[in-house]
Amino acid sequence: MMRRRRLLLSALAVLAVSACGQPDTDMSNGKFATPKDAALYQAAARGDLAQARQLLAEGASLNSRNVRAMTPLDVAMVEGNRRAFESLLELGTDPTWLGDARDTSMHFAAKLPDSYWLKALLKRGFSTEVKNRLGETPLFPALGTSTQANVQLLLDAGANVHVRSKDGRTLLHQAAMIGSFDDIPRLLDLGVDPRAVNEAGHTFQRYFFMGPRNPETEKKVRAWLSVHGIAVEDQM
């Protein structure tokens, strides 16, 4: 899980360096799949929808993915380019499209610290329940210390907290596995099943008690489990 975060940060750093690049530079650093896609992004960044539509008619794609499996919409979010972002949505980009990638743009937005992107997508009515290749909804990548605003946005939009991934993980499992321990008391209060086991046969407690954690959070979790008659599994 931490490796995924490191890969995302690496992609953010590479794209930030090239944020002002022209189409040829964008191609050389792998930011876009084809020259037409690079030109499409540049047109969107200028707000030139007529030129962008012409490029789409000539074969450019809103759904192309670069060497990091990022769509033009993902690139816009990473670069902080709101004009490109809004233009691409106006042109018909679907942030719930998965294709052959691991994540949709909804998942990508959910893991970014700047909540502007996810808020904008939710405001446009895109689903909170779209699943990635692992069967995760955007709530899974939204968990974490730097993305609490995204968790709240998804909850406010009615996201299902009882969802499970293909390998049986609940949001409690996810929070414990990535070390986002402060999310756990809230998820318990929201009704996520603490008895649920994943494909490996473990409840979230297996991952919560196996590593370093905040003493105050641990105290809250132990108290919650005790009040609800659930045995503490701290002897692994």
Please identify what each model-predicted range represents.
Residues P194-E233:
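Leucine-rich solenoid repeat scaffolds
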Residues R4-L9:
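N-terminal export leaders
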Residues Q42-G47, V75-N81, F108-D114, P141-T147, ...:
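Ankyrin repeat A-helix N-terminal signature
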Residues S18-A19:
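C-terminal motif of bacterial Sec signal peptides marking the signal peptidase cleavage site
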Residues D48-L56, N81-E90, D114-K123, T147-L155, ...:
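Ankyrin repeat structural motif
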